[in-house]
């Protein structure tokens, strides 16, 4: 294969059989279980990189079921997302996500900079309870519960919240194994959102300590709200808003 062909065909690795296809990435009946809680403000601020700002000491713990996604297939994801502001405008910062499928893990890290690790999240309905769990190896590190569809939420308001920009700290190491080749803050949004349902109810969240899945480093002090959402949406491509290596 000549150099010109490599340049023209290179998208992702392996060159001749990429781990994931080019976008757009459309999700049908994407199901969210989001528990927002109050946490320790000093610990939270220590984990959020400038120039993002933390308006309140809040964390959203998410369980997301994606049974029908373009190119990525059928998978589940779980992790912590932090409400932030950038240049005075509201958004979210994804701290860490854990999922059970390689293509979105590889694509998420390589394209946008999603901080993904391989684990075993689950989101299901158990009788009258919406139940989310996260296992890292044999260890249960997160359990979320909510009363199933106790009260409907306003769909337009929830769509606006989903449409807020999300920020990611994309880090790609140099081949020397010591320094970062890429270290940048990226921004992406969910697009073409079609809300199909939104509910709330009484909720609980239990986090356990684990050295490699440190979700409990942001302790649960108070549950603020819980939401169960179902929507079709497209995960938009990103843009770089801050380059930490620029001089």
Swiss-Prot record:
Signal peptide: none
Entry's EC annotation: 4.1.1.4
Alphabetical UniProt keywords: Decarboxylase, Lyase, Plasmid, Schiff base
GO terms, molecular function: acetoacetate decarboxylase activity
Active site: 116
Catalysed reaction, written as an equation: acetoacetate + H(+) = acetone + CO2
Entry superkingdom: Bacteria
Entry-linked InterPro entries: Acetoacetate_decarboxylase, Acetoacetate_decarboxylase_bac, ADC_dom_sf
Function, as annotated: Catalyzes the conversion of acetoacetate to acetone and carbon dioxide.
Entry's family note: Belongs to the ADC family.
HAMAP family with a match to the protein in the record: ADC
Protein name: Acetoacetate decarboxylase
Organism classification: Bacteria, Pseudomonadati, Pseudomonadota, Betaproteobacteria, Burkholderiales
């Amino acid at each position: 294969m000549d150099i010109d062909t490599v340049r023209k065909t290179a998208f992702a690795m392996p060159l001749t059989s990429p781990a994931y296809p080019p976008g757009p990435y459309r999700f049908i009946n994407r199901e969210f279980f989001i528990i927002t809680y109050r946490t320790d403000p000093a610990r939270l601020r220590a984990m959020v990189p400038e120039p993002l700002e933390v308006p309140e000491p809040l964390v959203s713990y998410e369980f997301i079921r994606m049974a029908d996604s373009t190119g990525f297939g059928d998978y589940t994801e779980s992790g912590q997302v932090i409400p932030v502001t950038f240049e005075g405008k509201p958004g979210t910062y994804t701290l860490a996500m854990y999922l059970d499928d390689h293509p979105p893990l590889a694509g998420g890290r390589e394209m946008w900079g999603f901080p993904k690790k391989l684990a075993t999240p689950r989101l299901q309905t158990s009788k009258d309870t919406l139940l989310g769990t996260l296992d890292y190896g044999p260890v249960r590190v997160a359990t979320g519960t909510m009363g199933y569809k106790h009260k409907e939420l306003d769909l337009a308001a929830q769509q606006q919240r989903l449409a807020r920009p999300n920020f990611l700290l994309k880090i790609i190491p140099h081949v020397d194994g010591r320094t970062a080749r890429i270290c940048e803050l990226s921004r992406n949004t969910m697009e073409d959102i079609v809300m199909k349902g939104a509910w709330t109810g009484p909720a609980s969240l239990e986090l356990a300590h684990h050295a490699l899945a440190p979700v409990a480093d942001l302790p649960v002090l108070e549950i603020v709200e819980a939401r169960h959402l179902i929507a079709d949406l497209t995960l938009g491509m990103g843009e770089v808003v801050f380059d930490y290596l620029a001089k």
